[in-house]
Swiss-Prot record:
Disulphide bonds in the chain: none
Nucleus recorded as keyword: no
Gene Ontology molecular function terms on file: ATP binding; tryptophan-tRNA ligase activity
Motif 'HIGH' region: chain residues: 12-20
UniProt record similarity statement: Belongs to the class-I aminoacyl-tRNA synthetase family.
Annotated GO CC locations: cytosol
Residues engaged in binding ATP: R11, P12, T13, G19, H20, G152, T153, D154, L194, K202, M203, S204, K205, S206
Entry keyword set: Aminoacyl-tRNA synthetase, ATP-binding, Cytoplasm, Ligase, Nucleotide-binding, Protein biosynthesis
Binding residues annotated for L-tryptophan, in chain numbering: D140
Record's protein name: Tryptophan--tRNA ligase
Species: Streptococcus agalactiae serotype V (strain ATCC BAA-611 / 2603 V/R)
Short sequence motif 'KMSKS' region: positions: 202-206
Subcellular location: Cytoplasm
Family matches, as InterPro entries: aa-tRNA-synth_I_CS, aa-tRNA-synth_Ic, Rossmann-like_a/b/a_fold, Trp-tRNA-ligase, Trp-tRNA-ligase_bac-type, Trp-tRNA_synthetase
Length: 341
C-alpha cells in the first residue's frame, strides 16, 4: 500500500526559532518517525526572494542554518527527503500553468497574504512575486502529490487556495492528475502561532523577540528573564494576571503532561498573589532547557561538517527533482503540451 505523502518547509530568512519548533518542526519529526508517511521537507528560498529580492545573501547564508536546525530537531535524510526549492526548476514551470487558473481578485482576497502585506509595509509597491506566492505554494505541494501539509493555523487559506487550483486544473483538463491536499494543524492551540517574548503577536528575528534553536543557554536565560508578564504585577504579594502573560502562555505550550499539576498550581498561586515573576521565569527556563539542550548539542555536532550538510541537501534535491519532473510530464500531457511524444 502506498504511503500518504507529506510536504512541508520553511523560508530560509534566518535561523529557526522555538515558534517554528512547536508550530511545525516537532510535528514533522513525529510524522517522520511513525514510518507511515513519505515526507518531503524543503527550504523555500524562491519564496523568500519575494520579499528579499535585493538581499539574496541573507537567504544564501540561511540555507545552512535552517538545514542545521532541521537535522538538530531530528529530521533524518535517511527517512525524509530534504531539498532546496530553487534547485527544482519544474516548480516554476508548474506555477506558470497554475497562474492562468487563478484570478488576481482571488489572490488579493487571500487573508494570509493580506495580513502579510500589511505587516511588511509594502504599501502600493507589492512585488508581483509576493502576491502570487500562494500559486507557487500550490506548485510545491502538487509537484509531489502531497496528501497532507503540516502548517500553522494561519496558513489554512493557503491550503484552501491550493485545493481550488487542483479542482480547477483537473476540471479544465478533464483529468485526475493533481491531488487535493489536506492541512495538518497543531493540536495545541497555544502552539499554533507562538507570540514573541514581548507579547507581540509574531515571533521573528527582525523584532528581536524570539528564542532561536541555535541560542546558547546563557542567551536563552537572558531572553526568558526579560519576557513580558503582567505589567501591573509590581509586588510579589499582589495578585497577577495570567492572561496575556507570556511566561504562562509558554508554559502551556512547552509543559508536558507530567508538568500540568505544577503549572496549574503556579497559575492559582500567581492569581492569588505571593508568587513572583522571577520564580515563574526560572521554572519556564528549566522547561525550555529540557527541550532545547539536546537540540543545541546535536546542532553543534552537525555544524562541524557543513560539507556533509550541503551534500545531504544536494542528494535530497536530486531525488525531489525526479519526482517533480514526473508530475510536470503528467501536467503537460493533460494540457496537450507533450508535442514530441
Amino acid at each position: 500500500m502506498t504511503k500518504p505523502i507529506i510536504l512541508t518547509g520553511d523560508r530560509p530568512t534566518g535561523k529557526l526559532h522555538i515558534g517554528h519548533y512547536v508550530g511545525s518542526l516537532k510535528n514533522r519529526v513525529l510524522l517522520q518517525n511513525e514510518g507511515s508517511y513519505t515526507l518531503f521537507v524543503f527550504l523555500a528560498d524562491q519564496q523568500a526572494l519575494t520579499d528579499h529580492a535585493k538581499d539574496p545573501q541573507t537567504i544564501v547564508e540561511s540555507i545552512g542554518n535552517v538545514a542545521l536546525d532541521y537535522l538538530a530537531v531530528g529530521l533524518d535524510p535517511n527517512k525524509s527527503t530534504l531539498f532546496i526549492q530553487s534547485q527544482i526548476p519544474e516548480l516554476a514551470e508548474l506555477s506558470m500553468y497554475y497562474m492562468n487558473l487563478v484570478s488576481l481578485a482571488r489572490l488579493e482576497r487571500n487573508p494570509t497574504v493580506k495580513t502579510e502585506i500589511a505587516q511588511k509595509g509594502f504599501g502600493e509597491s507589492i512585488p508581483a512575486g509576493f502576491l502570487v506566492y500562494p500559486v507557487a505554494q500550490a506548485a510545491d505541494i502538487t509537484a509531489f502529490k502531497a496528501n497532507l501539509v503540516p502548517v500553522g493555523t494561519d496558513q489554512k487559506p493557503m491550503i484552501e487556495q491550493t485545493r481550488e487550483i487542483v479542482r480547477s486544473f483537473n476540471h479544465a483538463y478533464n483529468c485526475q492528475v493533481l491531488v487535493e491536499p489536506e492541512g495538518i494543524y497543531p493540536e495545541n492551540d497555544a502552539a499554533g502561532r507562538l507570540p514573541g517574548l514581548d507579547g507581540n503577536a509574531k515571533m521573528s528575528k527582525s523584532l528581536n523577540n524570539g528564542i532561536f534553536l541555535a541560542d546558547d543557554m546563557d542567551t536563552v536565560k537572558k531572553k526568558v528573564m526579560s519576557m513580558y508578564t503582567d505589567p501591573n504585577h509590581i509586588k510579589v504579594e499582589e495578585p497577577g494576571q495570567i492572561e496575556g502573560n507570556m511566561v504562562f502562555h509558554y508554559l502551556d505550550v512547552f509543559g508536558r503532561d507530567e508538568d500540568q499539576k505544577e503549572i496549574t498550581a503556579m497559575k492559582e498561586h500567581y492569581q492569588k498573589g505571593g508568587l513572583g515573576d522571577v520564580k515563574t521565569k526560572r521554572y519556564l527556563l528549566d522547561i525550555l532547557e529540557r527541550e532545547l539542550s539536546p537540540i543545541r548539542e546535536r546542532r553543534l555536532e552537525y555544524a562541524k561538517d557543513m560539507g556533509q550538510v550541503y551534500q545531504m541537501l544536494q542528494k535530497g534535491s536530486e531525488k525531489a527533482q525526479a519526482v517533480a519532473a514526473s508530475t510536470l510530464d503528467e501536467v503537460k500531457s493533460a494540457m496537450g503540451l507533450n508535442y514530441f511524444k
